Regions:
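Conserved AMP-binding/adenylate-forming core of the ANL superfamily
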Residues: 70-74, 97
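Intrinsically disordered, tyrosine-centered linear signaling motifs in cytosolic regions
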Residues: 60-61, 204
């Protein structure tokens, strides 16, 4: 029988994130610190708007690109937060989560064999999306000594005449790294000089703890070269509503909308009405959640310091990325033993690329109470490993 599976699909490996949670779900008294999902409920006023839209019978398709009201609020939000002006008619597309936006942006822009530069460690979807778009993914291995930021030198050294697109995943999952304005200005200079485009994944833009997030699209000469990706899952605790958006040059958004039209039709109508409310009246909710995340972040950093576990200070998202190289085992081995012996699930850094070897992703999108119990178990485990090394 003929093989029914496409080669490029068979080439893609399943996400390394899920492995440990299939185990932990069956384990009594286990704690998971691995899922990148807010532990907060969607704020009630946002839920109410979704409920109200259902009660009013707003259950039909929207336009392919999304509700006019939502696209206008997205433009207002980006103008208010980043000082960027977009035309809601031609430069905004509402998608089923930020993940869909990443996928269709690559498919709309990349010709077979063109290169997509992907800094790693980073979100697991970028490389598979590039492969499915018939692109050649080129990995830029970020360094711990640079706090996992992308440098202009690393970018310049990687660009070839086949390079079309740079993925810029900051604030970063899994490291929590951010790019400050000066970093972005140096990157932008290379982008313009080399005449390539940027896919800027800014899904964690509201979750920064060292000043306001800066979008590369806000820098001179960059809006016309940037596809800005964002959404509602992380900032507004709306993961299950599955809603994101892309903003960028009209000719790119037009082609993305074409793919979206044939594959999806439109994003969920109920979710779109709820998102309008989130953008209009959700600032205080975001502030409260960000304050709670920051408290947890500080707790973890202090705990790592006390147990002598090396970890650079992350200023974005809701992850820490401690180094476990001192123990002489791989990230996967450490995570496996930690789960088996202490019943705590974390994610090996290698789930996010080879440069994540020797690190773990720990999410603090969990209650402080859970974090305290988990850190107690981590300290016990670390002390056990150090005792083993002395024998």
């Amino acid at each position: 029988m003929r093989n029914p599976i496409a080669d490029k699909c068979a080439e893609i490996k399943p996400s390394g994130i899920r492995k440990f949670f299939d185990i932990v779900s069956e384990m009594k008294d286990a704690i998971s610190l691995g899922v990148g999902e807010p532990d907060f409920d969607t704020p009630w006023h946002i839920r109410d708007e979704g409920i109200y839209s259902l009660e009013k019978g707003r259950t039909f398709y929207t336009s392919n690109a999304g509700l006019k009201e939502l696209k206008m609020e997205i433009c207002n939000y980006l103008k208010r937060k980043q000082g960027i002006t977009y035309d809601y008619n031609n430069e905004v597309l509402v998608t089923v989560g930020g993940s869909e936006a990443i996928d269709i942006a690559m498919r709309a822009m990349i010709n077979p064999g063109e290169e997509v530069l992907i800094p790693q460690p980073s979100y697991v979807s970028y490389e598979p999306c590039a492969i499915l778009a018939d692109a050649k993914p080129v990995i830029i291995n970020l360094k711990a000594e640079n706090e996992f930021r992308l440098t202009a030198r690393e970018l310049r050294d990687t660009i070839t005449d086949k390079t079309k697109l740079l993925v810029l995943p900051f604030p970063n999952n899994p490291t929590g790294a951010i790019m400050e304005r000066k970093d972005l200005e140096e990157i932008a200079e290379v982008i313009i000089e080399k005449d390539i485009y940027v896919l800027s994944d800014e899904i964690y833009s509201e979750l920064t703890y060292k000043g306001e997030h800066v979008s590369i699209a806000s820098l001179p000469g960059m809006q016309e070269r940037t596809i800005l990706i964002n959404g509602f899952s992380k900032a507004y605790a709306m993961t299950g509503w599955r809603l994101g958006y892309a903003c960028g040059p009209s000719e790119i958004i037009k082609q993305m909308t074409k793919i979206h039209q044939f594959a999806i039709m439109c994003a969920p109508t109920t979710s779109q009405y709820a998102a309008v409310e989130a953008l209009k009246n959700g600032d205080e909710d975001v502030k409260e959640m960000r304050t709670a995340y920051n408290q947890r972040r500080r707790f973890l950093m202090n705990a790592f310091k006390e147990m002598g576990l090396e970890c650079f200070e992350p200023y974005g998202a809701f992850y820490v990325f401690p180094c476990i190289k001192e123990f002489g085992m791989t990230s996967d081995e450490f995570a496996t033993r930690f789960l088996e012996e202490e019943k705590v699930a974390v994610v090996p850094g290698t789930a996010f690329g080879d440069s994540g070897e020797g690190f773990l992703r720990i999410s603090y999108a969990y209650s402080l109470e859970n974090l305290k119990v988990a850190i107690g178990r981590l300290e016990r485990f670390v002390n056990k490993l150090r005792a083993e090394q002395k024998k």
